[in-house]
Amino acid sequence: MFLKLFLLLSLVSFSHSDSSSTVSCPNGTDFHQLTTVFRYVSGFNSSWFSSNCSAVITHVVLPSRKLNGTVSWNPIRNLTRLRVLDLSNNSLDGSLPTWLWSMPGLVSVNLSRNRFGGSIRVIPVNGSVLSAVKELNLSFNRFKHAVNFTGFTNLTTLDLSHNSLGVLPLGLGSLSGLRHLDISRCKINGSVKPISGLKSLDYLDLSENSMNGSFPVDFPNLNHLQFLNLSANRFSGSVGFDKYRKFGKSAFLHGGDFVFNDSKIPYHHRIHRLPHRHPPPVRQRNVKTHRTNHTPLVIGLSSSLGALIIVIFAAAIILIRRRMKSARTKSRWAISNPTPLDFKMEKSGPFEFGTESGSSWVADIKEPTAAPVVMASKPLMNLTFKDLIVATSHFGTESVISDGTCGPLYRAVLPGDLHVAIKVLERIRDVDQNDAVTAFEALTRLKHPNLLTLSGYCIAGKEKLILYEFMANGDLHRWLHELPAGETNVEDWSADTWESHVGDSSPEKTNWLIRHRIAIGVARGLAYLHHVGTTHGHLVATNILLTETLEPRISDFGINNIARTGDDTNKNNVEFDVYSFGVILFELLTGKQGSDENVKSVRRLVKERRGEEALDSRLRLAAGESVNEMVESLRIGYFCTAETPVKRPTMQQVLGLLKDIRTVSR
């Protein structure tokens, strides 16, 4: 028993520390990288891992933890010692980066029973064109078509069952060391012959596809196989008694046009072609009765009663299973609440909280219940600062979404299953409380489809906290620069069309119409702010949140006006907002971050009438005739980023120009 417990604990490569404390590790540590990976995933709790900042993570094993959301894969690159990755049986979505398979130490990956999609192939990393992965389980997901296993030379176990591959994955025939292969229920059409050279297989499941081929000549060496399932396919061929006895009748059931040609096989098991789905009609015999005989009647009634009981029992079982399945489905697709940490609540303040950057902020109040949370969107909610502490696990690192220049941003689930983002405004600590309340109340009244309106606020001592609706799709910066191409959050799998055949990108990112719509939305929201006499002052891609339909919503507007300092004098005006929008437009069109260097480079290309060279290659490949629209949009960005502020257009003019681009092209 002790040995089993030890093996179970060893799945995580380092021991858990005391979860009663919240530790903030430097950015370069494995622990920090891991919390960043799951920052947009509901239900993740960093206390599952050691908070020892010097610990090295080799195993990430989190099966059946009710995780829900999109994994931010990029930080996993920095877990250089990672060997085992198991996120099975959760509700994670998106696609997998192609560089994942080239991580040198990664040998076992289990991502089964999630909602992952996209392509699977090895992309060279640091000169390596091969994958070290030996065991790979991607069953019960959403993978389609773009699958290539040419570089997976070390694979011994591969399970791709219950996906929608459509065709046999490329490169399977070259996996000489493969011992276990399961591609059942993958909607595969075509011949089985490409895998006939797999000589090491001892397990092969091809069931419930539409594959064809001649048995046994088109199949791998059957002498080494211990398990075989060819049922529900379109195969043909001759099955001898040795194969029948070894694999059983079920291996060939509905498998195609098989001939069982050995007299030792029972006659009723010799299936020559696909069996009928319904039994043949039973001929009724004429029965002559010369005298009354109650025995047949009793037997008939008994049989009928027995059959009725069996039918009722079977119906009850089916009903129970359907209800259980429905309950499991609802549980799986529901957004799970972050698991609260066991922490000790100080009886009296001040309360100090660490951040990812290593700094800290202090709520200098004696009682956490003394600071109310004012919810403009739900005025009847009775919340206090204590509720925010509990909802964020003591403002722990596992609840951090980001830690930017304005202050840390946390994810929380308040009573009533209200998902919110909480930002600590470090820059306005010294602003008078009454002035802050006046400003917050004014901001809660600004409502527009492209603004992320302030939901509420809390003032705890000098600390000012604001609450927004939580946006699970994250921000524009993350969507453009951090997420792997091919990501999809499409709920209807049967109609999932996000796969792309242009490189490794999805139509979400290669679609100019979507990026143009985002630009229009941001311009519309900013124009509204200027119309009501408010400026943003710090418009960047991380302050533009995306809804489930990729509709943009601007956040943090008006905050710079509260924290007016000498350094911000030139930023609290509409001209600076217009410049910032031009940078955003450049990011949307080039796919590059809006650094000063990139802005200068794009402006130079536009000025030299070489704007097409600056466009994101993913857009150019997929756009076709829309290239002219994108080049014209670059010119709008050029006007917005004019060095002389007075030469910049107004946001209302910018909005009109962006709308005209699509109107003229049509």
Swiss-Prot record:
Binds calmodulin (CaM) in a calcium-dependent manner. Interacts with CAM1, but not with CAM8. The gene is CAMRLK. ATP binds at residues 401-409, 423. Calmodulin (CaM)-independent autophosphorylation. Not stimulated by calmodulin (CaM). Disruption phenotype: Endosperm development arrested at one-cell zygotic stage. Increased resistance to auxin (e.g. IAA and NPA) and osmotic stress (e.g. mannitol). One of its GO terms (biological process) is embryo development ending in seed dormancy. Residues 319-666 are cytoplasmic. Induction: Induced after P.brassicae oviposition. Keywords: ATP-binding, Calmodulin-binding, Cell membrane, Glycoprotein, Kinase, Leucine-rich repeat, Magnesium, Manganese, Membrane, Nucleotide-binding, Phosphoprotein, Receptor, Repeat, Signal, Transferase, Transmembrane, Transmembrane helix. The chain crosses the membrane at residues 298-318. It is found in: Cell membrane. It catalyses: L-seryl-[protein] + ATP = O-phospho-L-seryl-[protein] + ADP + H(+); L-threonyl-[protein] + ATP = O-phospho-L-threonyl-[protein] + ADP + H(+). Can phosphorylate the myelin basic protein in vitro. Required for endosperm development in embryos. Maybe involved in auxin and osmotic stress responses. This is Calmodulin-binding receptor kinase CaMRLK. Disulfide bonds: none annotated. Its EC number is 2.7.11.1. Expressed in reproductive and vegetative tissues, with higher levels in seedlings and flowers, but not in leaves. It comes from Arabidopsis thaliana (Mouse-ear cress). GO terms for molecular function: ATP binding; calmodulin binding; protein kinase activity; protein serine kinase activity; protein serine/threonine kinase activity.
